[in-house]
């Protein structure tokens, strides 16, 4: 039996975020197209070279992108909306689809399954000519071969997942469009095979959550492709969960290899293999190293997995690989020497995970004695972090044990609370507000950097933050907003900021991962028990409130979002970590309230993304996610108004969960998803305060008043005006001042027009 090492995908952003910087330099016209393409090629080849040097045998090619791999596939197959037809060059079309332009609305963006990565949603239009517009995987395969002598493994997004992620067609059209994808995929695979590709990875992550009928439909497409390309060696790759429910059918697909996730889908996939075996004529690609977290693998557990598999599987060959693409992990931990030894030793970023694959391969091919020293090191590291004082706090354990049922609910029901809040807050019909953050200008970022580097004092930094806060309080008053925010100028990131002020968190210097486009985030590391230390937002919020007679809302990030946007310890259930965060936030909310803050927003944009892929697992997750929010927010007085915010989700799946949060007001992204949540509300009722975002903040274009008014008008057809709020889709941190002010002025004017119409019709 041959055993090979493989990787499913490598982080794109570069060790020092060179990829991000190159993109942004190109967008701002600081470099030309030739310089852009040259630099991107250098980064791309460097990533291949690193994997080659680490000892990976099957190196992914084509996982690199200028923005998003789903967008790459859409462009490649000709899924280009007609509104972009005036653009002629590849990059102009590509980036217009991703980012929009002054006159063109960008394609929708949403979460990649249950991760914090966003993809550009492919759009189908009637009359679309589906064809292989550009065989990008072939070009990149030949590039790696010619430049580095690497016979790589092309990686493509599979036809079924691609079309399932697309929008713009009816369910009745799906089968027809799916068949139209056969020809371009046949051409793509034929050309790769003819060029010498030994194995081609076809990603089908959606296979973890398909019905029996859908799997059969997918199989027919693969049979049609195989008929035309009989000799190509295809690796059907699944990840993010098991394919247990459809395993028996999936192993009959006409492919040479099947990749399964034995980290996040371990139990289900092992159960399926135990029940149905594995085809002797296929290669099993074993996802055994976690591609979504940053902890060292338990190599003893990994080797036990292979022992189990080798007893049950008479497979042709084995492939040792991560559970999914390493896109979701930082690149290398070597710069994180500021961390404690016990934490540093416990980490494994992308490059370290490649080393773990090679260690596993050595143990499997040469015996465990060949890595005996490494195994002993790993065991010691795991023992040290498990027994750490940071993971065994008695006060945190006691607080969790003391929780009672009444800690998870507000004293009065929503209708009675809202009446009291209206009396206390004296807000107009259709109140306007923003989601929280205002532009983080170059000056803001530079001043924060100088403060962190000790160039300016704490006092100077605080004075600067107060100056920015006052400036934007005045802007908001002049614009005419009803509920103001302080602007969050002191915050780098909505999760990092809180993590820096809570026990149990640690932070990397260079642990960046891609969120969307050039936007990178540096998730906190939750390594110990989480606990409140001191007030985190009191000073800035109270100062902002002192500057105005209008209501200023406190701004917090919710427990589930902090959890889902962090790298989380893996020694206790995520539910328990979420409850720890909720208890810490509960303390902060009580301090805000006692300081005179009457509206407090607790953002949960990541609540939906944490849901398991399989519907059967949803209830358990939603129960503890909702309970976490309630635990954080339920101790305030009835007169205190609790807001929350969500963005980029398939909300129809969680309307009941949103209702169960019992927030007085929820604001939801609406504009970029082209009003999908409005459609959801046509089929269900939502009886609490709600604001459906009226403009897309991820695009630089300033929408007109009429565009926003149209969304307000549509929203009021399904929402009670008494409970309706008007707000942007999301925070305005990444936009420029000259974009924000006119957009908010248009929004306020749209609100005034809507109020006038309601009064006229009353």
From Swiss-Prot:
GO molecular function: 5-methyltetrahydropteroyltriglutamate-homocysteine S-methyltransferase activity; zinc ion binding
Active site: 698
SUPFAM superfamilies from the UniProt entry: UROD/MetE-like
Pathway connected to this protein: Amino-acid biosynthesis; L-methionine biosynthesis via de novo pathway; L-methionine from L-homocysteine (MetE route): step 1/1
Cofactor: Zn(2+)
Methyltransferase found in the keyword field: yes
Pfam families recorded: Meth_synt_1 (PF08267), Meth_synt_2 (PF01717)
Binding site for L-methionine: 435-437, 488, 603
Function statement: Catalyzes the transfer of a methyl group from 5-methyltetrahydrofolate to homocysteine resulting in methionine formation.
Protein name as catalogued: 5-methyltetrahydropteroyltriglutamate--homocysteine methyltransferase
Provenance organism: Bacillus cereus (strain AH820)
Lineage, uppermost ranks: Bacteria, Bacillati, Bacillota, Bacilli, Bacillales
């Amino acid at each position: 039996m041959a055993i090979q090492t493989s990787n499913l995908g490598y982080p794109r952003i570069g060790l020092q975020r060179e990829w991000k910087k190159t993109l942004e330099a190109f967008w701002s016209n600081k470099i030309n197209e030739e310089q852009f393409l040259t630099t991107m090629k250098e980064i791309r080849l460097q990533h291949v070279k690193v994997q080659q040097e680490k000892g990976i045998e099957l190196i992914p090619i084509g996982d690199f992108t200028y923005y998003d791999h789903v967008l790459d596939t859409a462009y490649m197959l000709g899924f280009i909306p007609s509104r972009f037809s005036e653009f002629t060059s590849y990059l102009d079309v590509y980036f217009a689809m991703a980012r929009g332009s002054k006159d063109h609305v960008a394609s929708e963006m949403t979460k990649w399954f249950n991760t914090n990565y966003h993809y550009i949603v492919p759009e189908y239009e009637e009359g679309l000519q589906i064809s292989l517009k550009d065989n990008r995987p072939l070009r990149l395969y030949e590039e790696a071969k010619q430049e580095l002598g690497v016979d790589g493994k092309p990686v493509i997004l599979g036809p079924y997942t691609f079309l399932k992620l697309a929008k713009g067609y009816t369910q009745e059209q799906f089968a027809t469009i799916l068949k139209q994808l056969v020809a371009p995929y046949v051409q793509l695979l034929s050309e790769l095979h003819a060029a010498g590709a030994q194995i081609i990875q076809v990603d089908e992550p959606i296979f973890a959550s398909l019905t029996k009928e859908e799997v059969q439909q997918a199989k027919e497409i693969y049979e049609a492709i195989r008929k035309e390309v009989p000799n190509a060696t295809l690796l059907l790759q699944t990840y993010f969960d098991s394919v247990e429910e459809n395993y028996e059918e999936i192993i009959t697909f006409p492919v040479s290899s099947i990749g399964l996730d034995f980290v996040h889908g371990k139990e289900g996939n092992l159960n399926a293999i135990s029940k149905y075996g594995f085809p002797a004529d296929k290669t099993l690609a074993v996802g055994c190293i976690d591609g979504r977290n940053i902890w060292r693998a338990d190599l003893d557990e990994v080797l036990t997995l292979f022992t189990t598999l080798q007893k049950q599987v008479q497979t042709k060959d084995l492939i040792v690989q991560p559970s999914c693409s390493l896109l979701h992990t930082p690149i290398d931990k070597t710069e994180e020497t500021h961390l404690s030894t016990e934490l540093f030793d416990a980490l494994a970023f992308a490059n370290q995970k490649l080393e773990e694959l090679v260690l596993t391969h050595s143990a499997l091919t040469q015996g465990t004695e060949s890595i005996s020293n490494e195994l002993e090191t790993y065991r010691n590291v795991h023992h040290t972090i498990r027994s750490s004082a940071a993971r065994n706090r008695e006060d945190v354990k006691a607080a969790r044990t003391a929780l009672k049922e009444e800690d998870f609910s507000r004293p009065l029901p929503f209708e009675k609370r809202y009446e009291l809040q209206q009396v206390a807050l004296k807000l107009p019909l259709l109140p306007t507000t923003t989601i929280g953050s205002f532009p983080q200008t170059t000056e803001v970022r530079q001043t924060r950097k100088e403060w962190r580097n000790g160039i300016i004092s704490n006092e100077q930094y605080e004075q600067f933050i107060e100056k920015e806060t006052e400036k934007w309080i005045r802007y908001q008053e002049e614009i005419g907003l009803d509920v103001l925010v302080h602007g969050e100028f002191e915050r780098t990131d909505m999760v990092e900021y809180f993590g820096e002020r809570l026990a149990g968190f640690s932070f990397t210097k260079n642990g960046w991962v891609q969120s969307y486009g050039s936007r990178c985030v540096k998730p906190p590391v939750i390594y110990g028990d989480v606990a409140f230390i001191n007030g985190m937002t009191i000073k800035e919020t109270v100062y902002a409130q002192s500057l105005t007679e209008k209501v200023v809302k406190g701004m917090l990030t919710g427990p589930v979002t902090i959890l889902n946007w962090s790298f989380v310890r893996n020694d206790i259930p995520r539910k328990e970590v979420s409850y720890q965060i909720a208890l810490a936030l509960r303390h902060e909310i009580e301090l805000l309230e006692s300081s005179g803050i009457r509206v407090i927003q607790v953002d949960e944009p990541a609540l939906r993304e944490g849901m398991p892929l399989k519907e059967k697992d949803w209830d358990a997750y939603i129960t503890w996610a909702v309970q976490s929010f309630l635990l954080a927010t339920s101790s305030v007085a009835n007169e205190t108004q609790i807001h929350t915010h969500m963005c980029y989700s398939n909300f129809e799946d969680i309307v009941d969960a949103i209702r169960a949060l019992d927030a007085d007001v929820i604001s939801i992204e609406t504009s970029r998803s082209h009003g999908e949540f409005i459609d959801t509300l046509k089929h269900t009722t939502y009886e609490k305060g709600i604001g459906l975002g009226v403009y897309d903040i991820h695009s630089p274009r300033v929408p007109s008043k009429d565009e926003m008014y149209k969304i307000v008008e549509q929203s009021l057809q399904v929402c009670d005006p008494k409970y309706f709020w008007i707000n942007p889709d999301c925070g305005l941190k990444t936009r420029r001042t000259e974009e924000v002010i006119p957009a908010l002025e248009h929004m306020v004017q749209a609100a005034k027009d809507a109020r006038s119409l309601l009064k006229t019709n009353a």
